[in-house]
Amino acid sequence: MRNSTKQEDLVKAFKALLKEEKFSSQSEIVQALQDEGFENINQSKVSRMLTKFGAVRTRNAKMEMVYCLPAELGVPTTSSPLKNLVLDVDYNDAVIVIHTSPGAAQLIARLLDSLGKSEGILGTIAGDDTIFTTPARGFSVKQLYEAILVLFEQEL
């Protein structure tokens, strides 16, 4: 049990350091973690952590190349601000079309797919900012359309 707490502390410290956006090399991250009391940390472990958490090198405000973490997406839920990414929902006789903020369609489609057939969703196809979804057997297009409006708290 003590080991997992130590690991959690390491992950928390690692993420906090990367949020500072001032480390341009893995050795700088190793040194900073060692300064925080993680004596057993090495470059190889930092490299694995950078990969695991999807860290990327980008330019900070001072135009220096630094490591940083992408915005955390996690598993989407309907109570999260994802509903703010849905701009418009419409339908015809065959499909429901959902327009999202640029880049958000695949995330919203993932949420819809996770609800599955029991909620009336046969499947989704997502581009960058548009999603097509079709109802499962036993559900009408209009029923699914109304369920999606409720899900994302859109106006009926």
Curated annotation (Swiss-Prot):
Quote the subcellular location field of this record: Cytoplasm
Keyword set, alphabetical order: Amino-acid biosynthesis, Arginine biosynthesis, Cytoplasm, DNA-binding, Repressor, Transcription, Transcription regulation
Q: Name one GO molecular function term.
A: arginine binding
Keyword Protease present in the record's keywords: the answer is: no
Q: In which pathway does it act?
A: Amino-acid biosynthesis; L-arginine biosynthesis [regulation]
Coiled-coil parts of chain: none
Source species, domain of life: Bacteria
Kindly indicate whether the keyword Nucleotidyltransferase belongs to this entry: no
The primary site where this protein sits is: cytoplasm
| PANTHER family associated with the record | ARGININE REPRESSOR
Family recorded in the similarity comment:
Belongs to the ArgR family.
Job description of the protein: Regulates arginine biosynthesis genes.
This protein is called what? Answer: Arginine repressor
